[in-house]
């Protein structure tokens, strides 16, 4: 499937209609879903209606935006009015939101075509999309491998070209890690850049919505559409949003002397040698484009994982207290009193990993342990943020691997939670600091599985991240390789 800009030109020149483009996406979804399981819900009827509205505008001589008529996948933890939003959980099995999330509303206003809701780890808690209550998504590059998580459905859908772009959410790496595993571009914006209104909460101080795309430019276009202040979200930032793709040119090179820092702590034990080699070669490419390379130390980077697994479950234990079978979603049958209904609903409605994190969070917040765990974790979070602040006084952009490994086999880590958690080792500190970060393809291992390069920027420097990523993308061909799904 072509890029956003290419499809836009085809629509404007009336070489193709939005309905034709949408029909092509729906046919591809129908053909691939028995193997991939990227989508929990395909919204064919709504998609064709939205596409028809775009065609009517074109026929009337009206101007259309870049996203008009473009097939988009939506992670199923973003509320969509009249369309089921399950968070891949039994407890929200029949939940149909009465309102639209700000991010999806902005896409609808831009004329984008929603082709369906994508699979995820239940309540976005996981790193492989194996925690979904409904189905396990496969990696398009190797169907026996996981696509990453928690936004594995969105990553797989974009990688396999079931849709042009997709939305995901990132709490500790849930956009960037699956982007790395599936060989696509994934961006976690600065905390507060994109409204969280209508995003089902996991850990409110960490959650952020962002784009998946096959190219850096497409990711930039999608982020432009969803970014901006929203009075419905008290954490939404009041800042001007630049046109991220405005300075992209075929021979683009970063302006001025770009200083890039290699995060020293991300190399060493636990990092696959093939990943290390690919990232090192990517740094060489950036240096050849004129970047000045520095070795940077972020000494508390390694404390990100334990810090996250106190803070995120603590917030989750509070956020998920609302699911009790009273107002919406699943309600356990045969309960003989209110307390029994609560306990049975939560015991049978939540999956194993969600219950594990609720218990961890409840323990960390309990009397006698709050200071030792939650309060201490918040102090370490501040120290991690300070390390990044010091680094950005020396360099403009930080680089490191997105994940220590390439995609692992389905079932390989399901009985070992700690091993699963370690796949987000390099993405989590960025969420704790609220920084923007982007993953893009930088190579493949000897089994043909993609490797991701992570670029980390200072607060609200998405523009700089996109420019560096675009320069690297134009100097390489990794993004041109596509999975052959047999």
UniProtKB/Swiss-Prot annotation:
> Mind telling me which PROSITE patterns this protein's record contains?
AMIDASES
Q: Which transformation does this protein catalyse, written as a reaction? A: L-glutamyl-tRNA(Gln) + L-glutamine + ATP + H2O = L-glutaminyl-tRNA(Gln) + L-glutamate + ADP + phosphate + H(+)
What's this chain's function?
A: Allows the formation of correctly charged Gln-tRNA(Gln) through the transamidation of misacylated Glu-tRNA(Gln) in organisms which lack glutaminyl-tRNA synthetase. The reaction takes place in the presence of glutamine and ATP through an activated gamma-phospho-Glu-tRNA(Gln).
> Where along the chain is the active site annotated?
75 (charge relay system), 150 (charge relay system), 174 (acyl-ester intermediate)
Q: Which UniProt keywords apply?
A: ATP-binding, Ligase, Nucleotide-binding, Protein biosynthesis
Superkingdom of source: Bacteria
Gene encoding this chain?
A: gatA
HAMAP family to which the protein is assigned, alphabetical: GatA (MF_00120)
Give an example GO cellular component term for this record: glutamyl-tRNA(Gln) amidotransferase complex
**Could you give the subunit structure recorded for this chain?**
Heterotrimer of A, B and C subunits.
Please verify whether the record's keywords include Membrane: no
Q: What is its EC number?
A: 6.3.5.7
Tell me the protein's name. Glutamyl-tRNA(Gln) amidotransferase subunit A
Spell out the InterPro entries in the cross-references.
Amidase, Amidase_CS, Amidase_dom, AS_sf, GatA
User: A Pfam family for this UniProt protein?
Assistant: Amidase
The organism of origin for this protein:
Nostoc punctiforme (strain ATCC 29133 / PCC 73102)
The record's Gene Ontology biological-process terms are: translation
Q: Which family does it belong to?
A: Belongs to the amidase family. GatA subfamily.
């Amino acid at each position: 499937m072509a890029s956003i800009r290419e499809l836009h030109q085809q629509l404007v020149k009336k070489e193709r209609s939005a309905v034709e483009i949408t029909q092509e996406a729906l046919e591809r979804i129908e053909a691939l879903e028995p193997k991939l399981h990227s989508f929990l819900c395909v919204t064919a009827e709504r998609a064709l209606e939205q596409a028809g509205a775009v065609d009517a505008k074109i026929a009337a001589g009206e101007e259309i935006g870049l996203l008009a008529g473009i097939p988009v996948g939506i992670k199923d933890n973003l509320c969509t009015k009249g369309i089921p939003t399950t968070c891949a959980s039994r407890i929200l099995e029949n939940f149909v939101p009465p309102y639209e999330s700000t991010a999806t509303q902005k896409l609808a206003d831009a004329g984008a075509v929603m082709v369906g809701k994508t699979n995820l780890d239940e309540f976005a808690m996981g790193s492989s999309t194996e925690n979904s209550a409904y189905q396990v998504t496969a990696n398009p590059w190797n169907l026996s491998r996981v696509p990453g998580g928690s936004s594995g459905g969105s990553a797989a859908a974009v990688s396999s070209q079931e849709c042009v772009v997709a939305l995901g959410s990132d709490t500790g790496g849930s956009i960037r890690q699956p982007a790395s595993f599936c060989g696509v571009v994934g961006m976690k914006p600065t905390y507060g850049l994109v409204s969280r209104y209508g995003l089902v909460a996991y850990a409110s101080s960490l959650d952020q919505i962002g784009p998946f795309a096959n190219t850096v430019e497409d990711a930039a276009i999608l982020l432009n559409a969803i970014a901006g202040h929203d009075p419905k979200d008290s954490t939404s930032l009041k800042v001007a949003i630049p046109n991220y793709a405005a300075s992209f040119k075929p021979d683009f090179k970063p302006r001025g002397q770009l200083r890039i820092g290699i995060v020293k702590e991300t190399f060493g034990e636990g990092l696959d040698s093939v990943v290390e080699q690919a990232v090192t070669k990517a740094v060489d490419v950036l240096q050849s484009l004129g970047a000045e390379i520095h070795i940077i130390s972020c000494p508390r980077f390694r404390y990100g994982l334990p810090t996250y697994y106190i803070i995120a479950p603590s917030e989750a234990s509070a956020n998920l207290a609302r699911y009790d079978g009273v107002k919406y979603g699943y309600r356990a049958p045969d309960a003989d009193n209110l307390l029994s209904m609560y306990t049975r609903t939560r015991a049978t409605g939540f999956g194993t990993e969600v219950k594990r994190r609720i218990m961890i969070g409840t323990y960390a917040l309990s009397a006698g342990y709050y200071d030792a765990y939650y309060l201490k974790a918040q102090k370490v979070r501040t120290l991690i943020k300070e390390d990044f602040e010091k680094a950005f006084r020396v360099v403009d952009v930080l680089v490191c691997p997105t994940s220590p490994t390439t995609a692992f086999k389905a079932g390989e880590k399901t009985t070992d939670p700690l091993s699963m958690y370690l796949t987000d080792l390099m993405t989590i500190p960025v969420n704790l600091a609220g920084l923007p970060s982007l993953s893009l393809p930088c190579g493949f291992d000897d089994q043909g599985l993609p490797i991701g390069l992570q670029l980390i920027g200072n607060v609200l420097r998405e523009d700089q991240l996109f420019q560096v990523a675009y320069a690297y993308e134009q100097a390489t061909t990794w993004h041109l390789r596509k999975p052959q799904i047999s």
